[in-house]
């Protein structure tokens, strides 16, 4: 095993992130929102190089977010990596009444449907659009436009869902869940504008995103994630 940084001590849940930029926060904010919603004590570790051997042992995909946590008996260190997995882990470990993760099989099955849809469709489509539009050295207009077109298809699906009678949130009618948290960063006005889309074309989706954005936990998470790596300590362990 590669030697981990000396300041990486797992006494409680540790969320791994990178320095906050315009394009680095859309996935890391998801578990942070859930931690804020549930009031879970945690630490933040800002990774300087996700390609570092020690970090690839935590997440073989070499991306954030990722989590290390103590097992309930304190004997082992548990890990979760990729944003959807971190949401599922936090909900399973800390959402004891199932408010955000689902209270029964019926709720969890619907939550998993919309969580999986995001993981398989909007999430990766939006991520690759951002990559080809912002980071890829060669501009590929057809690729960029195809990905943007696929995003509109996903927005259409979400709009139809939210147009169903009484459907205030994606999975459940009465309250948000981890499916809403996963979807929000790529289905909100600022992100749609980044894609060059008029978010007003999806009025129910826009209403939903505003409703989600007004939650105090969501506000705190967005504020915090933007500042990671910009304080007195740029990289390494930051206490929550």
Curated annotation (Swiss-Prot):
Transmembrane segments: none annotated. Residues 104-237 form the GST C-terminal domain. Keywords: Transferase, Virulence. It is an enzyme of class 2 (transferase). GO terms for molecular function: glutathione transferase activity. The keyword Transferase applies. Disruption phenotype: Abrogates gliotoxin biosynthesis and leads to the accumulation of the shunt metabolite 6-benzyl-6-hydroxy-1-methoxy-3-methylene-piperazine-2,5-dione. Its EC number is 2.5.1.18. GO terms for biological process: gliotoxin biosynthetic process; mycotoxin biosynthetic process. Pfam families: GST_C, GST_N_2. Pathway: Mycotoxin biosynthesis. Residues 15-98 form the GST N-terminal domain. The keyword Transferase applies. It catalyses: RX + glutathione = an S-substituted glutathione + a halide anion + H(+). GO terms for cellular component: cytoplasm. Belongs to the GST superfamily. Glutathione S-transferase; part of the gene cluster that mediates the biosynthesis of gliotoxin, a member of the epipolythiodioxopiperazine (ETP) class of toxins characterized by a disulfide bridged cyclic dipeptide. The first step in gliotoxin biosynthesis is the condensation of serine and phenylalanine to form the cyclo-L-phenylalanyl-L-serine diketopiperazine (DKP) by the NRPS gliP. This is Glutathione S-transferase gliG. It comes from Aspergillus fumigatus (strain ATCC MYA-4609 / CBS 101355 / FGSC A1100 / Af293) (Neosartorya fumigata). The gene is gliG.
């Amino acid at each position: 095993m590669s030697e981990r940084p000396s300041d990486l001590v797992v006494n409680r849940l540790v969320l791994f992130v990178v320095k906050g930029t315009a394009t680095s926060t859309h996935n890391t904010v998801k578990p942070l929102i859930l931690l804020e919603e549930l009031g879970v004590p945690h630490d933040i570790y800002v990774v300087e190089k996700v390609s570092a051997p020690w970090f690839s042992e935590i997440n073989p995909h070499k991306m954030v977010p990722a989590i290390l946590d103590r097992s309930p008996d304190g004997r082992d260190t548990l890990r979760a990596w990729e944003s959807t997995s971190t949401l599922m882990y936090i909900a399973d470990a800390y959402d004891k009444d199932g408010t955000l993760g689902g209270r029964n099989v019926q709720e969890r099955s619907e939550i998993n449907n919309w969580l999986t849809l995001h993981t398989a469709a909007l999430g990766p489509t939006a991520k690759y659009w951002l990559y080809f539009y912002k980071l890829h050295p060669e501009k590929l207009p057809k690729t960029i436009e195809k990905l943007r077109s696929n995003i509109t298809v996903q927005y259409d699906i979400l709009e139809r869902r939210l147009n169903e009678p009484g459907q205030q949130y994606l999975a459940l009618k009465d309250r948000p869940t981890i499916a809403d948290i996963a979807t929000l960063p790529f289905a909100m006005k600022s992100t749609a504008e980044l894609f060059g889309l008029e978010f007003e074309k999806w009025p129910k989706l826009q209403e939903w995103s505003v409703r989600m954005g007004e939650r105090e936990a969501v506000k705190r998470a967005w504020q915090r994630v933007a500042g990671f790596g910009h304080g007195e300590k740029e990289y390494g362990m930051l206490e929550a």
